[in-house]
Regions:
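Bacterial N-terminal signal peptides
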Residues: 11-24
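Substrate-gating cap/lid alpha-helix
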Residues: 150-184, 210-211, 215, 227, ...
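Serine-esterase "nucleophile elbow" of acetyl-processing enzymes
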Residues: 30-81, 91-100, 257, 347, ...
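Active-site segments of SGNH/GDSL-like serine hydrolases
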Residues: 107-111, 127-163, 184-187, 194
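Conserved catalytic region of serine esterases and O-acyltransferases that act on ester linkages
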Residues: 38, 200-450
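N-terminal secretory signal peptides that target proteins for export/translocation
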Residues: 1-10
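Solvent-exposed loop/turn segments at secondary-structure junctions
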Residues: 49-52, 80-85, 110-115, 144-148, ...
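Oxyanion-hole/transition-state-stabilizing segment in secreted/luminal serine hydrolases
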Residues: 56-59, 63-66, 71, 85-121, ...
Length: 450
């Protein structure tokens, strides 16, 4: 046996080298567990019926397309109702891999909780391996909660309760596999549950006789030999309705989901900001250009050209911001006007009314994302319509042809998708907006808006 003697300084150098290696390895793993979109990325969003609704997934797509208009990004919906991990594995080749993705997100669990946790984790692990073999980057997204009035520790249905340990187990698996993971269950369960409970309190205070709606989550197949789950408790009304049903929220709930997922992906919240004085001078312009600024006839006007666009949140989902104000952190599209006299000011964009704000609101900074009427909303509606077309009939045609291995129909479907994407790419490019603000004391301090 050979004994090697080392000095204390040598041992310290070796220890430092080991620590440095460990640090580099950790940094590498941390880098692997991040999502950074690049030009020509193809993101396949695989999931169950909640993904197949094409709501929160479309909202996420709208965020990335408007925030990074110079990138050519491609999003592909791959959701099917009732799916579990095994279902996605069975259709993986023609419905996921066939898209030639660079990113694949897996959003499952709502149906998997009717089976054992081990099967869910094994399925997820197999999906990670398949995604990496394509090769593409896997992203794991937990199931959303059941909107039945459950909060942590006080669940109203066994189904919603069971998603909790499944989410914790998925988080652990993602850490072990060094995979990007987003937990939407825990940020949403108390938000939605308290919203239901506040709704019940409001009804009780008004002594309303509104009957409670029985819990009727979407039916799912039970695992072989599994017993039917216990019946859920009656569902109270929501203070702010999410739309849809307890398992499949509508636009408000789906906007909450999209916001939580984007926050979990550490999406950039800054769009642009501009500050002007009451005299029409440009004080600051960040990520935008301000031109033709002037004050004439009691009206402040200027032209604004942004580097990117705000998140086009649907007007039908504007109460999602009331329910989750942090949503606006993902779309900081700001206008400040300093030195205004007290009063109300009408703001228009491209000649269409956008908002009526007071001097304090404009001084603090108005987030223009909340202009749910006018020119910006017109653009948001147009973007949403094209994404709906892309992820609806065009997506369906492509997937049907892929499943049948019909090369001719697949080529035609691909051509249609590319044409729609070209139109969408043109639509999300920055455009100059003409802003006008009048009222209060612009040009004639002290005179209030009638």
């Amino acid at each position: 046996m050979i004994t090697v003697r080392r000095s204390a300084s040598t041992c310290l150098r070796l220890l430092a080298a080991v620590l440095l290696l460990a640090s580099d390895t950790a940094a590498t793993h941390a880098a692997e567990a991040a999502l950074h979109l690049k030009d020509n990325d193809v993101w396949v969003m695989a999931g169950d019926s909640i993904t197949a609704q094409r709501q929160h997934t479309n909202y996420i797509e709208a965020y990335y397309r408007t925030r990074y208009p110079k990138l050519r990004l491609h999003f592909r919906n791959s959701g099917i109702g009732g799916n579990r991990t095994g279902s996605v594995l069975a259709r993986f080749e023609y419905d996921v891999a066939a898209w030639k993705p660079t990113i694949v997100s897996i959003e499952l669990g709502m149906n998997d909780v009717n089976g054992p946790e081990d099967a869910y984790l094994k399925g997820m692990k197999d999906l990670i391996a398949k995604i990496r073999a394509i090769p593409a980057q896997p992203v794991l997204i937990s199931s959303s909660p059941v909107d039945d009035g459950s909060i942590m520790g006080d669940w109203r249905s066994p189904r919603c309760e069971k998603i909790h340990p499944f989410t914790e187990a998925l988080k652990k698996l993602a850490a072990e596999e060094k995979v990007v993971f987003v937990d939407q269950y825990h940020p949403l369960i108390d938000l939605w549950g308290k919203n239901r409970r506040k709704g019940a309190e409001a009804v009780a205070k008004k002594a309303a006789t509104q009957p409670l709606v029985p819990a009727t989550p979407a039916p799912t197949a039970l695992a072989a030999g599994a017993a039917a789950p216990p019946k859920a408790l009656p569902i109270p009304p929501s203070l702010i309705p999410l739309g849809g049903d307890p398992v499949h929220p509508g636009p408000v709930g789906q906007t909450n989901m999209a916001a939580v997922i984007l926050a979990g992906l550490k999406a950039d919240g800054e769009v642009s900001s501009a500050t002007l004085s009451v005299e029409g001078k440009v004080v600051e312009a960040k990520r935008c250009q301000i031109t033709d600024a002037s004050v004439q006839g009691g009206k402040l006007s200027f032209t604004r050209l942004d580097e990117s666009g705000p998140w086009p949140i649907p007007a039908t989902a504007k109460t999602a911001i009331t329910l989750l104000p942090e949503t606006l952190k993902l779309s900081q599209y700001l206008l400040r006007v300093t030195g205004l006299a007290d009063g109300q000011y009408r703001v228009s964009i491209n000649g269409k009314p956008a908002a009526t704000l007071n001097a304090r609101e404009l001084a603090a900074g108005w987030n223009i994302t909340t202009a749910f009427a006018g020119a910006l909303n017109d653009r948001a509606v147009a973007i949403a319509a094209l994404i709906t077309k892309l992820q609806g009939p065009l997506n369906t045609d492509w997937r049907a042809a892929s499943k049948l291995k019909d090369a001719e129909k697949l080529a035609a479907a691909q051509t249609a998708i590319e044409a729609c994407e070209a139109e969408l790419q043109a639509l999300v490019q920055p455009v100059a907006w003409k802003f006008e603000a009048e009222g209060g004391g612009l040009g004639y301090r002290g005179r209030l808006l009638a």
